[in-house]
């Protein structure tokens, strides 16, 4: 059971499992352009999912994965939240991070629904990490049980680094 602020939450959709092929998504970038998995075709993808970039844990998660993994060959680190693209852009500017890929699911929540990440009670995304290979095959997942806690950074970073 997943909890947020001590209360149980429910999700729509089916959580991704290792071995699944991730379905395409359509998210909004900080420049208001639309982005899909096709935009990152042929690259390994670390998808860091957070409820809101403006919280301490979410900020830490975004910064940690970008600092630890953005230099990996043929790899992109993508952070997805429900924040408006304007707030995401403001956060990047305030944090001095220019190369962070922040995408928003605010428009229709389809990413959260398809990947079983949308907390129905809050209309926010849960905390998770999804790692996909160049062919969008899922190689690692972590959906946290307590949204107010950190992901297992060490496990996720190691999983990303061992991808061939």
Swiss-Prot record:
Entries under Pfam families matching the protein: Redoxin
Enzyme class name: oxidoreductase
Catalytic residues of the enzyme: 58 (cysteine sulfenic acid (-soh) intermediate)
InterPro entries xref list: Redoxin, Thioredoxin-like_sf, Thioredoxin_domain, TPX, Tpx_CS, Tpx_Peroxidase_subfamily
Boundaries of every Thioredoxin domain copy: 16-162
Disulfide cross-links: 58-92
Catalysed reactions, as listed in the record: a hydroperoxide + [thioredoxin]-dithiol = an alcohol + [thioredoxin]-disulfide + H2O
Enzyme Commission code(s) on record: 1.11.1.24
Role: Thiol-specific peroxidase that catalyzes the reduction of hydrogen peroxide and organic hydroperoxides to water and alcohols, respectively. Plays a role in cell protection against oxidative stress by detoxifying peroxides.
Record NCBIfam families: PRK00522.1
Additional information: The active site is a conserved redox-active cysteine residue, the peroxidatic cysteine (C(P)), which makes the nucleophilic attack on the peroxide substrate. The peroxide oxidizes the C(P)-SH to cysteine sulfenic acid (C(P)-SOH), which then reacts with another cysteine residue, the resolving cysteine (C(R)), to form a disulfide bridge. The disulfide is subsequently reduced by an appropriate electron donor to complete the catalytic cycle. In this atypical 2-Cys peroxiredoxin, C(R) is present in the same subunit to form an intramolecular disulfide.
Similarity comment text for this entry: Belongs to the peroxiredoxin family. Tpx subfamily.
Protein name listed in UniProt: Thiol peroxidase
């Amino acid at each position: 059971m997943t909890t947020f602020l001590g209360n149980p939450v429910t999700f729509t959709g089916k959580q991704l499992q290792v071995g699944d092929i991730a379905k395409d998504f359509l998210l909004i970038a900080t420049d208001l352009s639309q982005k899909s998995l096709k935009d990152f075709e042929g690259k390994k993808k670390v998808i860091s999912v957070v409820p809101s970039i403006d919280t301490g844990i979410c900020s830490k998660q975004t910064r940690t994965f970008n600092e630890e993994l953005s230099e990996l060959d043929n790899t992109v680190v993508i952070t997805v939240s429900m924040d408006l693209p304007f707030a995401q852009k403001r956060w990047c500017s305030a944090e001095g991070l220019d190369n962070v890929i922040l995408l928003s699911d605010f428009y229709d929540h389809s990413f959260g629904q398809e990947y079983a990440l949308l907390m129905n009670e809050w209309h926010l995304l849960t905390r998770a990490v999804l790692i996909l290979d160049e062919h969008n095959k899922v190689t690692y997942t972590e959906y946290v049980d307590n949204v107010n806690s950190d992901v297992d950074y060490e496990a996720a970073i190691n999983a990303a680094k061992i991808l061939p």
